Amino acid sequence: MEFSLDNNINNGAVIKVIGVGGGGGNAVNRMIEENVKGVEFITANTDVQALKHSKAETVIQLGPKYTRGLGAGSQPEVGQKAAEESEQVISESLQGADMIFITAGMGGGTGTGAAPVVAKIAKELGALTVGVVTRPFSFEGPKRGRFAAEGIALLKENVDTLLIISNNRLLEVVDKKTPMLEAFREADNVLRQGVQGISDLITAPGYVNLDFADVKTVMENQGTALMGIGVASGEERVIEATKKAISSPLLETSIDGAEQVLLNITGGLDMTLFEAQDASDIVTNAASGDVNIILGTSINEDLGDEIRVTVIATGIDESKKDRKPHRQTRQAVQPMQQTTQSVEMDQPKSQEEASAFGDWDIRREQNTRPKVDESSLEQVDKKEFDTFHREEPNHNDDELSTPPFFRRKR
């Protein structure tokens, strides 16, 4: 029996990266300079002058009638209306993509206002949509910070996963003498590594193979995400590479609490099974929860002694973290050490009603005594209820005033 491949089947997932606004356009240019492969680049902006410097294959002027190519003037509503005017052009440029990265700098006009519109279009086309945005420096002012927060909230509603890079953390990572362009390149590396890592996962065959379906499983409708790549060599190479991959100092989130992790390990012919286990153990311990790890390994002889670890972690929203303690409200009961108060709190009503001891409870002081028919008590001699069977003396007031010693002598 002979088998043949359908020539109409796509040989690989189509990945597109669209930079929206000035910050997004700069990020795309730097990725092209870094020679990122297997991706189609698009730049969209309201500013015609900025578009002239774009190195992307496809360039889109947003809202030519509304803004006349003059930019959004740091007003998000202008950026939004400009993107809405150009919806058809945006849709045509994104057509055919399986995965779309949307990158923008939040807080300004075009990126903040247009990025959510672009994301909505991407989702409507059925593409796996990932947002990678930067939050402005605090010294840029509270108004810009407020615009950024509002834009991020809107974007999050229209993407599958979202990575937020904090510009403030650049001040903690880079040296004081680091040139500005080099500092911003550190932020762009988060996007570049994520895009290149996913592109490599999809296009390069692996010994334990990962494909686009695995990426989609981990990233679809998962909220806040973490993506990172770590490379190291030497005896502790897999430990160092994995720690680098899961600890991006510029991202506003950590892997702690992740529910889904895609982990790919690439090494030379000397990569061992135990190294794959070590990487998985590090990720599992860092996630510190009931994490689902999808593991892949691939061999690349060109790496030599180096090992490369790619991590995509999702499902780490703060709201999900807040709900975690509620799943662990009940604790294991330790006999002879449980206090009365904790028993009351942990004992479910169903157990109280269907207890093996019936209605009897060791906490007698809290039990409700059964009601007794008072009419039946009138027919019972009081002596039967006297615990010590003592007769109640019938004495008058004079006897009470007489000491007991003299009363016995009478």
Swiss-Prot record:
UniProt-annotated location(s): Cytoplasm
GO biological process, one term: FtsZ-dependent cytokinesis
Coiled coil: none
Compositional bias of kind Polar residues: 330-344
GO molecular function: GTP binding; GTPase activity
GO cellular component terms attached to this protein's record: cell division site; cytoplasm
Binding site for GTP: 22-26, 109-111, 140, 144, 188
Signal peptide bounds: none
SMART domains in the cross-refs: Tubulin, Tubulin_C
Keywords: Cell cycle, Cell division, Cytoplasm, GTP-binding, Nucleotide-binding, Septation
Biased composition annotated in UniProt, kind: Basic and acidic residues: 360-398
Broad class of the protein's primary localization: cytoplasm
Annotated spans, Disordered: 318-410
Gene3D superfamilies: Tubulin/FtsZ, C-terminal domain, Tubulin/FtsZ, GTPase domain
Subunit-structure text: Homodimer. Polymerizes to form a dynamic ring structure in a strictly GTP-dependent manner. Interacts directly with several other division proteins.
NCBIfam families hit by this protein: ftsZ
Family: Belongs to the FtsZ family.
Entry function: Essential cell division protein that forms a contractile ring structure (Z ring) at the future cell division site. The regulation of the ring assembly controls the timing and the location of cell division. One of the functions of the FtsZ ring is to recruit other cell division proteins to the septum to produce a new cell wall between the dividing cells. Binds GTP and shows GTPase activity.
Protein name (Swiss-Prot/TrEMBL): Cell division protein FtsZ
